[in-house]
Amino acid sequence: MAETMFAEHWAGEGFPCEAGSGETIVVITGDGGLPTRAHELLAARRRVIVFALTADDGTAREAARRIGAAVAALGVERFDVMGEGAGAAAAMWLAAAAEAEIGSVVLAAPDGVPDEAFGEIKRSALVLSGTKDQSAAGDRWRTLLPDCHFMLVYDAGPAIGAERPEAVAFIALEFFERRDLFLVSRENGVVFP
């Protein structure tokens, strides 16, 4: 597979990286890093816009507001959202925004304690946790979210997207495309045990 090139764009308050075409996935990472192999794999089938949070971004709620404005400035009206690590809270605040037209939410190795307000969100969500992740964060998020699916990614710790990019991309795409039916996969997942 050819390497996907992410382009950096000025979108008001943020500098997201973007690649791919088609339906949009907005990814919010909590590590301030560049797009990963998992993002490249997502961009092979969808348009992917990656926002990397840093310590200077303020609260998750403030970051979500800025990201929502940046996504709107890029002309995106409807999208799915993926929050990774500390980016999970910003992803959920974005999903909670009344003006956001979001399909589904994937939280990959969510970090921290979720806000109780997230329990009111009626959007379909998937929490991915690695089997080597010793934190209870995934369980906390899964328990709070009312329409939440939970899936373990084998042989992965908290850096789930870096450690198992193919598995994360495969599962996320299945969920975004099939939502509640994604567990009945159209493809054999044996390559991602």
Regions found by a protein language model. Name each.
Residues F15-D57:
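Conserved HGGG/HGGXW glycine-rich cap/lid loop of the alpha/beta-hydrolase fold
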Residues C148-H149, Y154-P193:
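Catalytic active-site module of serine/aspartate enzymes centered on a nucleophile-bearing elbow/loop
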